[in-house]
Amino acid sequence: MTTANVEQKVKNIIADQLGVGEDEIKITSSFIEDLGADSLDIVELVMAMEEEFEVEIPDEEAENIKTVQDAVNYITTHKK
């Protein structure tokens, strides 16, 4: 899976979970500051990404995933 594919799937998950348009989601978007997510939204996003990409994201790692780019980087690095 290419980085572009991962990025698109991450954006799809964010759009579904947060109810924002994909056109509002930039690679540099912060989940909390730019997309209006709260802590529960972040947990749900992480769970959705774990399921979609079949990757485990430990809580201490999830705390460092603050932007779309962070999520894409983590998934492309840790995906089997």
From Swiss-Prot:
InterPro entries attached to this UniProt entry: ACP, ACP-like_sf, PP-bd_ACP, Ppantetheine_attach_site
Protein's pathway: Lipid metabolism; fatty acid biosynthesis
Example of a GO biological process term: lipid A biosynthetic process
A UniProt-annotated Pfam family: PP-binding
PROSITE patterns (UniProt xref): CARRIER (PS50075), PHOSPHOPANTETHEINE (PS00012)
Domain Carrier, first and last residues per copy: 4-79
Superkingdom of this protein's organism: Bacteria
Subcellular location: Cytoplasm
Coiled-coil region(s): none
Any one Gene Ontology cellular component term annotated for this protein: cytosol
UniProt family annotation: Belongs to the acyl carrier protein (ACP) family.
Name of protein: Acyl carrier protein
Biological source species: Anaeromyxobacter sp. (strain Fw109-5)
Gene designation per UniProt: acpP
